[in-house]
């Protein structure tokens, strides 16, 4: 996890990397002492590029390039804490939030007398490529994406196990690592294309 610690418009800790887990984070970049002032903290994952604010009334940004291949997409998290004074116990808690949209799919049976096999699921018309996220808004929340990339021509193909068994009439294709991780956006031109087949009494019907 990368971090930025700012005194107004100047960075006190610039791009310092921390490693560890909840309650146990450490850096090999040296020892830092709290200055006699309020601080702002910005945290972000290592898969992004950080840009410092241009002025004292601006916020930093991170840029990210969303891979077209879902298996290469990452879960991007950030944290922001403003106007912090030195804690009496020397402990600072940062609450991270997910800033991409996680998408999984499940299919509900229309007629239980049929056998359904979903062969492919593709999302088209959703913008990808490069985007910039600006910190700000309510502490611990907020921030905005500016998506400058376009939607990939072939869309995003959802990878799943189509041999799963229906439970209570629903095929749930969610697995540990098969989520689509896309930018939050208005999907006015987006489509979900599902290719599937149904079987009954040795007869097969293919639909899209």
What are these regions (language model features)?
Residues 3, 8-125, 160-176, 181-200, ...:
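Short, low-hydrophobicity acidic/polar segments
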């Amino acid at each position: 996890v990368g971090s930025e610690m700012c005194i107004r418009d100047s960075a006190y800790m610039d791009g310092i990397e921390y490693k560890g887990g909840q309650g146990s984070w450490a850096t090999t970049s040296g020892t830092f002492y709290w200055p006699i002032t309020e601080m702002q903290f910005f945290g972000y994952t290592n898969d992004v590029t950080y840009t410092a604010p241009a002025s004292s009334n601006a916020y930093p940004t991170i840029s990210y390039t969303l891979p077209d291949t879902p298996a290469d997409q990452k879960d991007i998290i950030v944290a922001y804490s403003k106007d912090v004074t030195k804690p009496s116990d020397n402990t600072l808690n940062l609450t991270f939030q997910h800033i991409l949209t996680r998408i999984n799919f499940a299919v509900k049976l229309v007629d239980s007398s049929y056998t359904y096999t979903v062969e492919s699921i593709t999302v088209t018309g959703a913008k990808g490529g490069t985007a910039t996220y600006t910190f700000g808004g309510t502490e611990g929340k907020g921030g905005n994406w500016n998506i400058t990339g376009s939607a990939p021509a072939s869309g995003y193909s959802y990878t799943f196990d189509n041999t799963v068994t229906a439970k209570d009439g629903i095929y749930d294709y969610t697995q540990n690592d098969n989520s689509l991780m896309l930018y939050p956006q208005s999907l006015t031109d987006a489509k979900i294309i599902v290719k599937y087949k149904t079987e009954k009494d040795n007869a097969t019907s293919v639909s899209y």
